Amino acid sequence: MIPAAVKDALTNNYASYVRPFLWYSGENKELLAREIRAIAASGAKEFVFENRGGDWFGTDFWWDIFGFTLDYAKSLNLRVWSIDDSHVNTGSANDSLHKEENAQYRAVNLRLDMVDAAGPLTGGAFSLPGHTENEKIVQISAFRRDLDSGNSYGEALDLTDCVQDGLLVADIPDGVWRIYYVMTTDPERHGLFGKYITMMSKDSCRHLINETHEKMYEHFADYFGNTFAGFFSDEPAFGNCDGQYGPNAYNLRLGMIDKMFPWWHDFPQRLAEKCNSTPEDVMKKLPALWDSVDEVSASLRLAYMDLVTELWQKNFSEQLGKWCEEHNVEYIGHNLEDADAHMRTGWGCGHYFRSMKGQHMSGMDIVFEQLTPGISTVDHAMNTASRTRSSTFYHYTLPKLAASLAHITPHMKNRALSEIFGATGWTCGLTNMYSLFNHTLICGINNYVPHAYAIPVPQVFESHQDRENAAGSVTPPGYCLTYLPPTFHAGGYNPQYKVFCDIIKYVQRVCHITSTAQHKPDLAVYYCAESDWMNCGSYRSMDDVSMKLIRSGYDFEFLPLETILNEAAAVNGKLAVNNEQYKALILPMSEIIPEALLKKIAEFADSNIKVFFTDALPVRTENGAVDASLLKNIHVLPWATLTTELAAAVSHDFAVAPAQNDLRHYAFTDQNGTDGVMLFNSSLKPIEFTLPGRNHLVYDPWANKLYRLNGNTLQLTAQKIVVVYNDLAQSDLELYPTLPEKYSELDLDYNIFVRSATEKEFKLLRGNSKAVNLNIAEKLTRFCGEFRYESTFECNNANMTTLIIPNAGDAAELFVNGISCGTAFGPYCIFNIKGALKNGINTLQINTFDSPAYADRKGDKNIGWGSGFPLRAHGFTGSIMLG
């Protein structure tokens, strides 16, 4: 029996899972239509219209262009989404907050200044800290300081009413005191975010809807729910930062004295309710958000972050989601997740799960060179201002966050979306695209927004006709027709576009299988945002835990606090949420955890749920020392021995022998109750292992073929995904291809033909030549095109099944005796040539495809971000192997 989803995939009969961005920067309708046709040719069935570089949103020009887009898409049976603001980041409300009439919707933030004083001091005064006319001091408090720890402590003095004539006129008792000045911030301190909406106000978020969503509906109501699919939020933010996207953009936590934090006029009352206190008491203790105040900081910070993330969820995400539902469309998008921004303010969203609760799909992005195949356990350098990034976060944590949110949120229908490729540059060619897709597919991502299609033709390819075709395009003063590589079609000049379209179809096949199935994880892992919020002790990074578990052969999902408290249940010795079940709950070590969490996990442990902390047990909650009786059935997994001790306590549902650190798996049950597992070799070398079970059916989604396994041993080549079903193989299926033990080296001479990206015909570049480095031999360091290698060789064993090009560039397509053997990804291209060889003379044709990386470099219209990946070779070099 072939599973139904696999049957669909074999015939490319799948739903829509890929919706690329279409970057629009003022081009005319003819060029816009050309790019929409290119999207349709890729196999994508929808796209996201992304406004870039123009101030025309909401003008007659915009309505005309977007109306044309909808009509043309409809004629091609495509659906259209739209970014939900005039530009990235979502929240400018079409730049309407620059108008003073909308000033009431602008964000309010607080900052801190302070001075230390040794008392007693009587009859004197203190100068107020410098502040602009747009800043107002809202609270002045003083705390004693502990001269051993440096922390503040004790009862606060409220000095707010002691200001006279620009001075703080107050007596200070005996001891060392720290005087804190809490004030609103000048919007000028926040750069672009100074004129943005605030998630702290329902009315402010509604203003965004009024300026974008309602106006779109007014003009295009007839398209809503059919051709028009919905809205995409792109990196909305709290905005309590300087608005500069630099190396310190994400490092914004409570407990950092120099930072600014969101505020609103009703916060004193709201915080008082959460703290079981009074507004006056909350204001007096407010400096504990910034500085360490014993017995105050943890509880106040927890309450504060609980409040601001709750407001984001209700005011922004759920309000937008509800509006979309009421208008028969859907709401998708993602926030800025990098470097723990997903649980912090500033550029971040404070709480990954809450921030997208109103969306109809979870969201994330992999852009720049954030995820580099082959580098997964150490930080890696990037060609951006932040210089280095955490490989572990992008490989092991971020995609699992997105999949987890989709799986535990019923209205998301298991749909986890990732924007992908943005700003990775032309060096992100076919091989990297294939790998990046696979690294996220294996985590459960099943919807994608590839970034991007862009209409401008790179100048190096641009012809006189292209310039004439661009006539009528419109750009406001100070703007230009720009693009951000990779732009997949590149006006028809990208030699890789044909294979890119094949990749899109491949991704849709894999997404179809996982989208129609129920995930079967081993474990649940606590999403420890609260530990980061309180910032009152050490804790084990979720990234460390993610990497350790995955490389130990476990699959898992993250659960946030409110899910653990309100939705998780003990069912037959397992933890259950929605349709997911987990054999154990793992909590990253934290010195301090929320008291409500401690009580709940103790309840689970008493119900025979296995509950573990990594490293050590917590020592306190926001309310004081831990009640030791609550920990009696909770266990510790020492970090050094976590893998072995966890394996002794919790069995793997799926395990291979020998264990493979680089093998990733995603187990599932399909709609008919058939169990399957998706496997991914995340390394850059082939791996071999023995599968559990027998009579395995293997689906190769790239080749789009079914195989049976010879015994239980499976070989997976580098960066490859297969889907395996136990006990379903049919005897008439071809055996899954394996790598031969021995190879013959073929050091052939080739006729090497070339076609540049701007030419239609191939011409001979080198005759009777070895496969040499063309950058050196032909000085092709500014070239982009296709290469065709033609040769012949003699064979006396037509039963050989494998041809390998060990030193290929981005990708290669192989024909043996005119028979297509498919396309493989570099640099180590492996082809199944079974049945293509014959005894005697054989013909060989190898086609390769450049990305525009060598030719179209930074400058001109190319914004030029993302050049961190290596430029891959033209064609290939050296011998090939036959076995």
Per-range role (PLM):
Residues I2-A4, D8, N12-Y24, N28-R34, ...:
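Carbohydrate-binding surfaces of carbohydrate-active enzymes
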Residues F793-C795, N799-N817, A824, L844-T848:
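Aromatic-lined ligand-binding clefts that engage carbohydrates, nucleic acids, or primary amines
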Residues S204-G230:
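An active-site-proximal structural segment forming one wall of the substrate-binding cleft
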Residues I721-V723, T801, N839-D856:
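Short, well-structured beta-strand segments enriched in hydrophobic/aromatic residues
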